[in-house]
């Protein structure tokens, strides 16, 4: 999904500007890019804000009101930036914090109403595929298989592939914010015996890696 912030600003030579927004469990990023007629691009500006949208959400299953308000406030500014740069389109992606929260759909409706930005909430596997496309596009051609790992706030994506195609991919619910919220005391940073035992049980998920990397 995409949202036209302003009328198409493509120049006579076919150049156009687009905004790309990535809403994660911890950070919110905006990249403004000029797309040239030959398909190449130039990065015009990049912005990153630590909105901590997923803070506490993985414990309760709901996004907190203060986290949502903080995120919407930053998104308003990003929408304004897209207008200033004459972006003809905004591509906005939301990941683990939104897709796992019971109130995620309601939050996305609020975002559209308050900012005009229409987000696409992607699955874990689609997130892994998009990460692979981004990373592999910068690799030299090779048929050798590689393991791509992206550790985010709410999930970890893994892909096995070469520079041309992926062979297997998966997404695990093992992000740094998720694990910190679930197992560590938010004030002292310590971990109780009960939570340590639960953390050890979570290691069972790593057995999924064996099937992923076995080609």
List PLM regions with ranges.
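Conserved phosphate-binding catalytic cores of ATP/NTP-utilizing and phosphoryl-transfer enzymes
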Residues: 2-16, 123-147, 207
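Gly/Thr-rich phosphate-binding beta-strand-loop-beta motif of the actin/hexokinase/Hsp70
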Residues: 11-41, 135, 141-172
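Short glycine-rich, Thr/Ser-proximal phosphate-binding strand/loop in the N-terminal lobe
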Residues: 28-66, 162-195
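N-terminal, Lys/Arg-enriched amphipathic/low-complexity engagement segments
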Residues: 68-72, 76, 80
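Short beta-strand-loop/turn "lid" adjacent to the catalytic site in phosphate-handling enzymes
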Residues: 79-110, 211
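Short, ordered loop/turn segments at secondary-structure junctions
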Residues: 95, 124-126, 163
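A glycine-rich helix N-cap at a beta->alpha junction
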Residues: 116-122
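Single conserved hydrophobic/aromatic residue that forms the stacking wall/gate
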Residues: 204-215
């Amino acid at each position: 999904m995409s949202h036209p912030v302003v009328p198409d600003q493509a120049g006579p030579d076919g150049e156009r500007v687009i905004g790309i927004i990535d809403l994660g469990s911890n950070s919110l990023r905006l990249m403004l890019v000029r797309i040239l007629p030959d398909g190449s691009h130039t990065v015009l500006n990049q912005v990153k804000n630590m909105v901590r949208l997923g803070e506490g959400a993985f414990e309760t299953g709901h996004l907190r009101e203060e986290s949502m308000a903080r995120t919407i406030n930053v998104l308003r500014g990003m929408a304004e930036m897209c207008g200033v740069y004459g972006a003809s389109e905004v591509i906005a992606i939301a990941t683990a914090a939104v897709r796992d929260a019971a109130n995620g759909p309601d939050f996305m409706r609020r975002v559209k109403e308050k900012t005009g930005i229409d987000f696409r909430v992607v699955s874990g596997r689609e997130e892994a595929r998009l990460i692979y496309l981004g990373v592999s596009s910068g690799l030299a051609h090779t048929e050798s298989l590689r393991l791509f790992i992206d550790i985010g706030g709410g999930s970890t994506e893994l892909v096995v592939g070469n520079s041309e195609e992926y062979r297997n991919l998966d997404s695990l619910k093992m992000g740094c914010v998720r694990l910190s919220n679930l197992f560590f005391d938010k004030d002292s940073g310590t971990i109780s015996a009960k939570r340590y035992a639960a953390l050890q049980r979570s290691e069972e998920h790593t057995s999924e890696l064996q099937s992923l990397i076995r080609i």
